[in-house]
Structure formats: structure tokens, C-alpha cells
Design a protein with these regions (language model features):
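Short amphipathic alpha-helical segments that predominantly mediate membrane engagement
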Residues: 1-65, 87-198
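Ordered, amphipathic secondary-structure segments that act as subunit-interaction surfaces
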Residues: 72-96
Length: 198
């Protein structure tokens, strides 16, 4: 295991995470799984931070695919070994994260069963990993996550969310994510006020 800068090179996956999000043996497991498929893992841990903004825009764990891997996937020329390695990586990551305790503090409320915000970053696009869905739906997500991505989407700042019920990918700009978050907050506030009045 080695920590380096965030730039991913040929056949490489980078992972940036908050300190203490993973144990050394968990990173080693991810690294060993990728090595079997000829893919290197580069890691970068950063100090925990307070977020003053829309949470969906700030991942606690961020995954970077090297441009060579991303391009091979888009062109449909990724070897089965690389594709199998990527699928195993995401499956292993989900299993590791689901066993861990993440704490979220907001408005003086502490949630000790929080799900971390995980992004897969390709170019300017961020695919938000749906960790809270069952394994079969997650497998489907991983199989399909690159299908609708193309060069234009990758070159624009987009946030990609997966709707497990509809099995669709929804694309939003940063502004749209902000507006959606505000609308959700507003509806929640109105709902709370209505309940209080009753």
C-alpha cells in the first residue's frame, strides 16, 4: 500500500478518503484485488473537514479512474480482466463500507449510522455510488454505470445519481443539485410545520 498524489496513471484507480475511514488491511484488500487484474491502486487520505454547503457535492470517499481505463470502457475495448477488476473493486468497497460506522453531525443532531457520500470521478463528472441498495441492484448499477456516459458528459461538471427503483441514471448540474437540495429541505420544513400545528 502506498499513498501518493491524486493523479491516476495507466490502468490505475485512485481513492481519496478521510483519515480513519479505512483500516490499513482494508486498503490492502482493495489493492490486492486490483493487482490480480493488472490494475494499480493509489491512495490519498485527507484530514476530516466540516462542510458548509450541499452535502451531495462533497464526497467523503472519492474514486478516480485513470483516463486509460475510462477511455477503454467508453470505447468498449476494456479487457474482461480490467472490467472484472473494476467490478470486484466496487463490490469490495461496498462490503467494506457497509460494515463500518460513519458519523454525521448536522443541526446539532448526531447520526452514528450515516452512509458516506462516495463519488466516482471521471473527468468533470461525479457518479454517486448508491451504497444503501441491495447487492443485486448494486451489481446492475456497476454494469450499467458507464453505458450512458460519453465524452460530452465527462467534459462537463455533472452529478450522476442512480434511482434503484426506476433503474435509471439521472444527471444534474451543480446548480440543479443545489436547487433540488433546497426544494427537499423546503418540503421537509413545511412538513414539520404542518405536523407541529396539528
Amino acid at each position: 500500500m502506498y499513498q501518493t498524489n491524486k493523479k491516476a496513471t495507466t490502468n490505475c484507480i485512485g481513492i481519496e478518503y478521510l483519515q480513519n475511514a479505512f483500516e490499513p488491511e482494508e486498503i490492502e484488500e482493495l489493492e490486492n484485488n486490483l493487482n490480480k487484474f493488472g490494475i494499480k491502486l493509489k491512495t490519498y487520505s485527507s484530514a476530516p473537514k466540516y462542510i458548509m454547503g450541499i452535502e451531495e457535492l462533497f464526497p467523503q470517499i472519492q474514486i478516480f479512474l485513470s483516463s486509460d481505463i475510462a477511455q477503454a470502457i467508453y470505447l468498449g475495448i476494456a479487457s474482461s480482466a480490467i472490467w472484472d477488476g473494476i467490478k470486484l473493486f466496487f463490490r469490495s468497497l461496498k462490503n467494506i463500507v457497509k460494515k463500518k460506522t460513519f458519523t454525521h453531525v448536522s443541526n446539532n443532531k448526531v447520526n452514528t449510522k450515516a452512509t458516506p457520500n462516495i463519488h466516482v470521478t471521471i473527468g468533470e463528472s461525479h457518479i454517486v455510488l448508491p451504497i444503501d441498495i441491495d447487492d443485486s441492484k448494486f451489481e446492475y448499477f456497476v454494469d450499467k454505470m458507464f453505458d450512458s456516459m460519453d465524452k460530452d458528459i465527462v467534459n462537463e461538471e455533472k452529478y450522476v445519481f442512480y434511482d434503484a427503483e426506476k433503474q435509471t441514471f439521472e444527471y444534474y448540474t451543480r446548480h440543479e443539485v443545489t436547487m433540488k437540495s433546497y426544494q427537499d429541505w423546503k418540503e421537509k420544513q413545511n412538513s414539520t410545520e404542518t405536523t407541529t400545528e396539528e
